[in-house]
Amino acid sequence: MALKGNLRDFTVTQLLNLINLAHKTGSLVVEGPDEAVLLYFREGKLTFAQNGQEDNSLATILHKSKKLNATQHQIIKQWAGNISDKELGLLLINASYLTQQDILSSLQMYFIGVINHLFTWADGFFSFENDIMPPPDKITVRVSLENLIMEGTRRLREWEHLQDEIPSLDMALKFIDRPGLNLRNVNLSVEEWKVVSYINPKNTMH
């Protein structure tokens, strides 16, 4: 029987904790207003993740992780045609183009990024189906959820704190009144002065 609900009632943290503690195997689909995320787990560990709007082919993930430059990415996409990610991975390894670790670490980084993005969702419908495995042509990894949950929770708290400090990105920027303070006597780097020069009531946080 599928576990279904809304993130307003059952948060991403609670979902991942349940999957982790119960050592669940299956797929989790989360649908937001504008995008959807698909995750797969095996015995409570993340094995595959996909943002429905993104190109999640192996070649593109390797390009995003800077294992392939733009030219290499384009050539491989054209040359690889319709071969699967597993086949492409083996070809790249056998040709000494990349190592197995290069490929697995790039995939792991991408999958973790999908999870971290999901932590920012406060609304959306989810459905967990038991014993559903990733497509057989995809390369899987095994990522412990414990550290992801702790890191995701930490980032969420930081974001909530930031929202308390800056409730709207449309807020105007201005200096506070400090009588006697002369900016000419302040030592700042070039980049810091660029930021200072942007502070103007006409500008917002955007």
Predicted feature residues:
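Acidic, Ser/Thr/Pro-enriched low-complexity segments and adjacent helix/loop capping patches
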Residues: 1-206
